[in-house]
Amino acid sequence: MFAVIKTGSKQYRVAKDSIIKIEKIDGEPGSTIEFKEVLMIGEYSKPSFIGTPIVKGASVTAQILNQLRNQKVIVFKKKRRKNYRNKRGHKQEVTQVKIIDIAKASNC
């Protein structure tokens, strides 16, 4: 079974026991969180159930593993012949979570 969840401004396709990196969520490592915005639930042998826009009653439970920072992204700006160079780096804070359970709604 898999699900598509929305957290932050992104959508993620998750399955049970999968480990994903999402935008930073406050919480200690080891604590559990629940995602209520489930956009789609599906099984590999059956047709998928797509929400309008979310699946009512469905939820995904996850456990926080780590609070991390992604790899550095370099932003470099230059204007030729003007001696203008600007180099900056940015590391986005992310949360690594493990999907524990996908709960279907009664109408799925």
Swiss-Prot record:
Transmembrane segments: none annotated. InterPro entries: bL21-like, bL21-like_sf, Ribosomal_bL21, Ribosomal_bL21_CS. Keywords: Ribonucleoprotein, Ribosomal protein, RNA-binding, rRNA-binding. GO terms for molecular function: rRNA binding; structural constituent of ribosome. It comes from the Bacteria. The keyword rRNA-binding applies. The keyword Ribosomal protein applies. PROSITE patterns: RIBOSOMAL_L21. Part of the 50S ribosomal subunit. Contacts protein L20. This protein binds to 23S rRNA in the presence of protein L20. PANTHER family: 50S RIBOSOMAL PROTEIN L21, LARGE RIBOSOMAL SUBUNIT PROTEIN BL21M. Belongs to the bacterial ribosomal protein bL21 family. NCBIfam families: L21 (TIGR00061). This is Large ribosomal subunit protein bL21. It comes from Orientia tsutsugamushi (strain Ikeda). The lineage of its organism: Bacteria, Pseudomonadati, Pseudomonadota, Alphaproteobacteria, Rickettsiales. The gene is rplU.
